[in-house]
Amino acid sequence: MTPDTKVRVASISKVVVAMCAMSMADEGLIDLDAPLSDYWGSGVRNSYSEVQPSVRTLMTHTSSLRNLEITRGLSHLRGLLQRPSTWRSMEPGNGGYWYYSNFGLCVLGTTLELACGGLLENYLQEHFLQPLGASASFYSETLEVGQLAALYTTGGVGRSVAEQMAQTTPTQIGQTASYFPGGFTASARDMAKLAAVLANDGVYKEPVYRSIELESTQDTHGIVGVILQLMENRYTETRLLSAESVEALEQPYFTVDPITSSPFQQCLILRRQEDILGQNVLYYHTGSAYGVFALMTYNPETRNGVVVLTTGAPRNTDDRGLYALCADLSEKLYEKMDGDPV
């Protein structure tokens, strides 16, 4: 594997969906606090609560949805959401009822599709990946086969390249729903570009190079060369999210105590911990599926960030609730960066 090998990043995919949600909020396409029925129809509601679930409650895992299996299909999802049995008797947004929900991300991503009137994949490509020059997708079958990593568990192949390429490419709203909780495929380099947008308050900074042409001489036998030289402290800046939207993503809502590891603050999809990996504060998300263990972190103070994607490692977690190998590598990388910006 290299920094450009494309890996299914598992639950870090949720951060990508969250960034799309905030971009749509910037554009006025979606209201984070509107009831889901505004997008799904009046039959979609929690009949046990006066307060109704919203995009914001989906992003804090407090939507009041029960723990249903990951699924897809617009009519199927709408049917589920219209059933009283799909909902818990709780007030959406209440952190005391926090429950990490992959099914909730199926609903969140499809809500965004209904809001923009198209596939979230297309929105993501247009608003983030193309401006970043990133080759990544929720549809791994659309990527170059030679760039995909086979996913390994400690016992063998978790998901082969052939299996990843055999996925069908959705063409209708709702068909991608099962991909949103964990199906985004990207290289560490391209995932780091997305993390850099968050670390830099919504702006991506592309380093600027200047070309220097080497003149032909007798010694070079008429061959002319060009070298690229990095221009110090020069960047091309592209704003992809408003600073207000990044601030909203980073806003802690309540503290979750997993019992088996340190408590963390739940933000909009992102998590927050202080005094972690040698940093004063980090926003982060983990990912685990089919033998992949992954970690995306960034420090809003130094604007440094690290993305680690692994496959084939044993499942070990540290006392912070992070996958141990990812955490160890991340801490070493933060030490090396020593305050340099992303």
Language model features with spans:
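A short acidic/glycine-rich loop-to-helix N-cap element
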Residues: 312-325
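N-terminal leader/targeting segments and the immediately adjacent pre-domain N-terminus
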Residues: 1-7, 23-31, 60, 113-114, ...
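Short, flexible turn/loop "capping" segments at secondary-structure junctions
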Residues: 1, 170-175, 299-302
